[in-house]
Curated annotation (Swiss-Prot):
Belongs to the aspartate/ornithine carbamoyltransferase superfamily. ATCase family. It comes from Nitrosomonas europaea (strain ATCC 19718 / CIP 103999 / KCTC 2705 / NBRC 14298). L-aspartate binds at residues 94, 179, 234. Heterododecamer (2C3:3R2) of six catalytic PyrB chains organized as two trimers (C3), and six regulatory PyrI chains organized as three dimers (R2). It catalyses: carbamoyl phosphate + L-aspartate = N-carbamoyl-L-aspartate + phosphate + H(+). GO terms for cellular component: cytosol. This is Aspartate carbamoyltransferase catalytic subunit. Signal peptide: none annotated. Pathway: Pyrimidine metabolism; UMP biosynthesis via de novo pathway; (S)-dihydroorotate from bicarbonate: step 2/3. Its EC number is 2.1.3.2. Carbamoyl phosphate binds at residues 66-67, 116, 146, 149, 275-276. The keyword Transferase applies. Keywords: Pyrimidine biosynthesis, Transferase. PROSITE patterns: CARBAMOYLTRANSFERASE (PS00097).
Length: 316
């Protein structure tokens, strides 16, 4: 492989593992390709033959409904054969190693692995291990990265705001446990967003988060002033220790997005959420269902973005 673990020797995308270090030209190419696929979802026949004859294996070692479903829909729209494996109850529980599992599936002529795992670095490990004709997409690994979520977020921002170069973007909530936040920050920076803010209590921020080039706020009143894009994050109770948080009610009081807090941002600001959403914890229903929310379009764009990634990896 080339200088970057995701690129081949020609500088083309070989795997999608993280947004960190991905060149802007590749990020833009994915977004442009996704734009060309949005029309497919509007057609009577929602299929194009770009992945016909290819086998795509969904390896989800962590539960997921939305991400797994959108990957499956995206692959099927490209005419791929999709094999869904519930890894949580399969060979892994019988003691087979991750790479043994991958070797066995590779022997079944897999062309692409879509991997979600609770261990950071799992997708990188698989990418280093597989034959060069097999492509790996990271669908979320531990606290580390979730690149396709960040890409669909970038696509959504570009749809509503056109240009990245004059935006103030705030990421609000459980930054500490969020692989989405890390991927968003890397993508926003690469695409030229001049000001990225993170707003969270100190207990929900990673150490030295400022090194990522973000402005840190612990207060919504200050942090939301003149913001163009609000990216809400859920509290990840499954990755959290009780010490991180007094109560969800108290969290909502200070960090939940209400109409009153949203009014501090720009009047044309958009509200995003990667899902699943906890109403009454990080976001008020009135905001989630309101005119500034783009949460449902985000989900829809996820299909086109994942189609784009798979299509580019397959050499189209």
């Amino acid at each position: 492989m080339g200088v970057h673990p995701q690129l081949n020797k020609n500088g083309e995308l070989q795997h999608l593992l993280t947004t960190e270090g991905l060149p802007a030209v590749i990020l833009r190419h994915i977004l442009d390709t996704a734009e060309s696929f949005t029309g497919v979802t509007e057609r009577d026949v929602k299929k194009i033959p770009l992945l016909r004859g290819k086998s795509v294996f969904n390896l989800f070692f962590e539960p997921s409904t939305r991400t797994r479903t959108t990957f499956e829909i995206a692959a099927k729209r490209l005419s791929a054969d999709v094999i869904n494996l519930n890894m949580a109850v399969s060979s892994q529980t019988k003691g087979e190693t991750l790479l043994d599992t991958v070797d066995n599936l590779s022997a079944m002529h897999a062309d692409m692995f879509i991997v979600r795992h609770n261990q950071s670095g799992a997708a990188h490990l698989i990418a280093r291990h597989v034959r060069p004709e097999i492509h790996v997409i990271n669908a979320g690994d531990g606290w580390h990265a979730h690149p396709t979520q960040a890409l669909l977020d970038m696509f959504t921002i570009r749809r509503y705001k056109q240009d990245f170069h004059a935006l103030r973007v705030a990421i609000i909530g459980d930054i500490l446990h969020s692989r989405v936040a890390r991927s968003q920050i890397h993508a926003l920076t690469t695409l030229g967003v001049p000001e990225i803010r993170v707003i969270a209590p100190k207990t929900l921020l990673p150490a030295k988060v400022e090194r990522l080039g973000v402005h840190v706020y612990h207060n919504m009143v200050q942090g939301l002033q003149d913001v163009d894009v609000l990216m809400m994050l859920r509290l990840q109770h499954e990755r959290m220790e009780s010490a991180h948080l007094p109560s969800t009610e108290e969290y909502f009081k200070y960090y939940g997005l209400t109409p009153e807090k949203l009014a501090l941002a720009r009047s044309d600001a958009i509200v995003m959420h990667p899902g699943p959403m906890n109403r009454g914890v990080e976001i008020d229903s009135e905001v989630a269902d309101g005119t500034q929310s783009v949460i449902l379009p985000q989900v829809n764009f996820g299909i086109a973005v994942r189609m784009a990634v798979m299509s580019i990896l397959a050499g189209n």
